[in-house]
Amino acid sequence: MYVGRLDKVIKHKQYGIVIIEHKSTSAYAKASGFRSDYISSWSPNSQIDGYLHAGHMLFGDKVSGIWIDAALVHKTVHNKFRFIPIDRQFEQLDVWLHETRDWIQRIEDEKSQADRSPYGGYAKNTGSCNMYGGCAYRDICKFVAKPSDREADFSGYRVSKWEPFSILKLEQLKLEPEK
């Protein structure tokens, strides 16, 4: 079962069904408004490929693609918006599905290995601790050797289990999550 949320789905007179994904960026370029690396970051992109896969599951061959509805957020430029059209061949979506299943299997294998390890937990990727504004768990890693051995909450952190099936109320549809 694949769970997610599409920002918007439209029926276009010329293009049929189009999935709209709203995005904002501060990646500014004087010449065009949007930096070229931002424009190209959507292809390939696992999130977008997943939405397109879901779109084809829901609407079949009526889906013509995804349009990234990009808005530039900048201190002096307030009028830069752009649609970035994205499409994939079915073979590319098949590869996305294979790779996604591979990542799921890797995570399950890592969890099994972590459960058996005397050190507990997953292996850390310490080269990424400061990327994207920094990891939210950096302080725990700095001061606690084996977080998995601790039952109590860490100061400043809240334990919250993400349960999308509860949010979607699948029991009302008489569906159950896959085991």
Feature map (PLM): residue ranges:
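Non-catalytic protein-protein interaction segments used by genome-maintenance enzymes to assemble
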Residues: 1-48
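Metal-dependent nuclease catalytic regions and adjoining charged, substrate-binding loops involved
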Residues: 32, 40-43, 50-179
